A protein has these predicted regions:
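A glycine/threonine-rich phosphate-anchoring loop and its flanking beta-alpha core
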Residues: 9, 109, 114-148
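ATP/NTP phosphate-donor binding region
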Residues: 1-94
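Hydrophobic, well-ordered secondary-structure scaffolds
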Residues: 77-83, 100, 113, 128-131
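Glycine/serine-rich anion-binding loops at beta->alpha junctions
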Residues: 93-112
Length: 148
């Protein structure tokens, strides 16, 4: 049950990175009424169900995406944002990315532009996402002119 926290300090902000066992139940992690989980459809259902079970007290919206570079697009982002707005998500609510770098980039982009910024939690599931995409605050999607 040991939880570890690393504080990242940048020029513009400070934020925590939590790591360790059983951190999903950390109440300070979410502090929201509604949570949107955006997940890679290759994540085993048993793991997604464990996450969902830990969030049972929240109003949940779950997206399981077929992940490719085409997923990291304005079209996909707009569809999710429109649905979040229809469900009255607001700035006090949270988006959780549960997957690799593509899911993290898309989810953080959505969180950053919806209602001028929703809370964001990244649960990276690939090594590259753990050491690169989940640290540093990069948000981005691909465009017709190139990969972000």
């Amino acid at each position: 049950m040991k939880k570890n926290k690393l504080i990242v300090r940048t020029k513009s902000k400070t934020y925590p990175i939590y790591f360790g066992k059983n951190i999903l139940n950390n109440k300070n992690l979410y502090n929201a009424k509604k949570i949107c989980v955006i997940s890679d459809n290759r994540i085993p259902k048993v793991l997604l169900n464990k996450l969902i079970k830990s969030l049972k007290k929240y109003q949940l919206k779950i997206y399981r995406l077929h992940v490719s570079e085409k997923t990291k697009s304005l079209t996909v982002a707009n569809k999710i944002i429109d649905q979040l707005l229809e469900e009255n998500f607001n700035r006090s609510d949270c988006i959780i990315a549960f997957g690799g770098g593509i899911v993290g980039d898309l989810s953080s982009f959505i969180a950053s532009i919806t209602k001028r910024g929703l809370k964001f939690v990244n649960i990276p599931t690939t090594l590259l996402a753990q050491v690169d995409a989940s640290i540093g605050g990069k948000t981005g999607i691909n465009t017709a002119q190139g990969k972000n």
